[in-house]
Amino acid sequence: DVHSGFAPRGARVEPGGPAYPFSLVERDRVLAPEVAQLYDQAVSSQWDATRDIPWSRVPALPAPLEAALGQAMTFLAENELAALYVPARFLSRVHPAYVETALFLATQLADEARHIDVFLKRARAGGGAPGVSATTTSRSLLSLLQTEDFTEAGFLLTVLGEGTFLDLLRFIEEHAPDEVTAEIVRRARADEARHVHFGLAHVRHALACDPGLFGRLEAAVRRRAATLAGVTSMPAPLADALTILAARGIDPPSVARGHEAVRELLHTMHEARIRRIVKAGFSVEQAEILSGLHTPNFM
């Protein structure tokens, strides 16, 4: 009831109250069974970007590695800004009767803010600077920000986008040039895994309650793919940065190994997306198609 305002669930509400502009009022589209448990996990897993990262141990890196790291951190921060702004658009639309979802989204915003903070700090901590913001990244993220449906946004951002980011963060952790970078992305990946779990629970529950949603989610993926039809690969500055991080240098044999590592990363991302889409409730055949349509920008 939009006339119950901010009354907690179970409270007795006097009649005659004003109508509130909550648009997310259908339980099946808002409150998945696991949300309360995920909120508790989120609260107990918060970490401090100042105290829990060993900033004093940031090393001096060779210039090519420093530049590559700055570029990677720039890309991560830019995408995490989108992951901050998109859920924020929906938080105030959630009816307070489903406060568990609102509370979880609040922890997600806190997580993303912390990630943005540490990624940008790491870009500068070794004497480097943020890198290039690619036009293709900007186009991809705008298409997320323009998504108006809560479940569609959850599927595009969380299941597909943040799910793909898990593999990117794991790759950067494996090839991190120092322990500080590895610790940053390890902690961020743990948070992102929780976000993906929430997204999967949300979409899976909504699909179980509304089979017609399968077609609408597929249509959302196809619309976004059409909007980004000219985006055929990850941004070149990011591809170069990941290659150099994996290569640990810029000599030709090392760069060749770095290229192969990035190629394997893209394959891993595709296969992992398929598994997550299947977990959400789609068939393997549908999942293969939807994964193939996902933005090369990763998020």
PLM region descriptions:
Residues 56-63, 91-92, 112-113, 138-144, ...:
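Short hydrophobic/aromatic-rich motifs at helix boundaries and adjacent loops
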Residues 102-106, 183-186, 215:
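Short, charged, amphipathic alpha-helical segments
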Residues 1-102, 124-130, 148-152, 209-299:
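Terminal targeting/low-complexity segments that flank the catalytic cores of oxidoreductases
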Residues 166-175, 182, 194-212, 218-237:
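An internal, amphipathic alpha-helical element
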Residues 76-84, 105-123, 155-166, 188-199, ...:
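Alpha-helical transition-metal enzyme core signature, strongest for iron centers
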Residues 121-193, 223:
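Active-site-proximal alpha-helical scaffolds that flank and shape metal-associated catalytic sites
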Residues 97, 101-104, 111, 177:
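Short, glycine/acidic-rich beta->alpha junctions
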